[in-house]
Amino acid sequence: MSSSYDEASLAPEETTDSFWEVGNYKRTVKRIDDGHRLCNDLMNCVQERAKIEKAYGQQLTDWAKRWRQLIEKGPQYGSLERAWGAIMTEADKVSELHQEVKNNLLNEDLEKVKNWQKDAYHKQIMGGFKETKEAEDGFRKAQKPWAKKMKELEAAKKAYHLACKEEKLAMTREMNSKTEQSVTPEQQKKLQDKVDKCKQDVQKTQEKYEKVLEDVGKTTPQYMENMEQVFEQCQQFEEKRLVFLKEVLLDIKRHLNLAENSSYIHVYRELEQAIRGADAQEDLRWFRSTSGPGMPMNWPQFEEWNPDLPHTTTKKEKQPKKAEGVALTNATGAVESTSQAGDRGSVSSYDRGQPYATEWSDDESGNPFGGSETNGGANPFEDDSKGVRVRALYDYDGQEQDELSFKAGDELTKLGEEDEQGWCRGRLDSGQLGLYPANYVEAI
């Protein structure tokens, strides 16, 4: 028996990572604490997504508000203006849906996890969770008898291995003494007695080692059964968590997936209908009747001189006022066409930004920058030393001598309020004074 002994067996036995090793149940216990932390992680995850949904919804709202104003003030008109505006309506409605997503995530999903976590994990006064302590105590109790046997086994194995080592050393010394002349017979006998004693120690320690190993083998089935029972209890607890969180994730998916939301689908169905409702021919007819050859015209006629009427008219007096329904000679059809276009709802921002026709008059009284006698003896802009700074939204080329010209982004000074015809007085940074369409600028 001793002759087969190998010194390599004296090296400490490598411990395995098996669940059955003493103390390796702690990973299963730790999983309970991890489950509580994972609930917190999921709630934080949902809360961050809710913030994103809220921010995105607000961005859509701000974007829609800004562009709706720009479209209303811009030159686009007619049914295409309404179709373009439908994009802004879509943004407002989608913003509301994303706010609903945010509310569902916080009020339903997050609260659901929070309540389940509170019911599943019970904190102790001394710290930790009741469920963790129960699992720890269960495993420790199940492993205690087997761990005690394993300790005895380790001691018996160590004693046996040490005896084998002593035996081998004694045999080596005894063999070497036979070749040495200096060793006396008495010394030779002592070395032989040492070998015999070591062999007896090896026999005793081996028998004890085998007996303890046999006892461990007898207790192993009961040990495995007890450990398995506690482990299954932990598995059942973990199964509840896994199933619950899967349900929550499906709820989150349902709330996030707007593609399956009937309201979301309806938004884009309405948007498509609004865009397809744009009619180029209708818009062209409307423009023809309001700003083209279809407009009414007070064609020149012979007029008798009337001493009771002023000889000149101002710029505003020369403009036809559609809203007042003025009947003009030879323009009945055009007026009716204009009225019909209005009935169809083709009210456009273009009306508000349309430059007015050039007067057919050489009289200087029609020019606000003309002689002092015609304009009450003073330039109407000279008293406006102060004003409001504005920025041009679009390019505008003055059509008349008294109109300003500027490019989009240019800044100028507004010197008066908008008149009933949609014009404002202003001053360029160069010092030039004149009129400009009020809806072509925005306050800075």
From Swiss-Prot:
BP term (GO), one: regulation of endocytosis
Keyword entries, A-Z: Cell membrane, Cell projection, Coiled coil, Cytoplasm, Cytoplasmic vesicle, Endocytosis, Lipid-binding, Membrane, Phosphoprotein, SH3 domain, Synapse, Synaptosome
Domain F-BAR: 13-283
Entry keyword annotation includes Cytoplasm: yes
InterPro entries xref list: AH/BAR_dom_sf, F_BAR, FCH_dom, PACSIN1/PACSIN2_SH3, PACSIN1_F-BAR, SH3-like_dom_sf, SH3_domain
Location of this chain's protein in the cell: Cytoplasm; Cell projection; Synapse, Synaptosome; Cell projection, Ruffle membrane
Modified residues (Phosphotyrosine): Y394
Keyword Cell membrane found: yes
Alphabetical list of Gene3D superfamilies matching this protein: Arfaptin homology (AH) domain/BAR domain (1.20.1270.60), SH3 Domains (2.30.30.40)
GO cellular component: axon terminus; COPI-coated vesicle; cytoplasm; cytoplasmic vesicle membrane; cytosol; endosome; perinuclear region of cytoplasm; photoreceptor ribbon synapse
Signal peptide: none
Composition bias type Basic and acidic residues, residue spans: 314-324
Stored Pfam families: FCH, SH3_9
Domains as described in the record: The F-BAR domain forms a coiled coil and mediates membrane-binding and membrane tubulation. In the autoinhibited conformation, interaction with the SH3 domain inhibits membrane tubulation mediated by the F-BAR domain. DNM1 binding abolishes autoinhibition.
Job description of the protein: Plays a role in the reorganization of the microtubule cytoskeleton via its interaction with MAPT; this decreases microtubule stability and inhibits MAPT-induced microtubule polymerization. Plays a role in cellular transport processes by recruiting DNM1, DNM2 and DNM3 to membranes. Plays a role in the reorganization of the actin cytoskeleton and in neuron morphogenesis via its interaction with COBL and WASL, and by recruiting COBL to the cell cortex. Plays a role in the regulation of neurite formation, neurite branching and the regulation of neurite length.
Family, as annotated: Belongs to the PACSIN family.
Quaternary state and interactors: May form heterooligomers with other PACSINs. Interacts with MAPT. Interacts with TRPV4. Interacts (via SH3 domain) with SYNJ1 and WASL. Interacts with DNM2 and DNM3. Interacts with both COBL and DBNL. Identified in a complex composed of COBL, PACSIN1 and WASL. Interacts with EHD1 and EHD3. Homodimer. Interacts (via SH3 domain) with DNM1; the interaction is reduced by DNM1 phosphorylation.
Protein name: Protein kinase C and casein kinase substrate in neurons protein 1
Gene name in the database record: PACSIN1
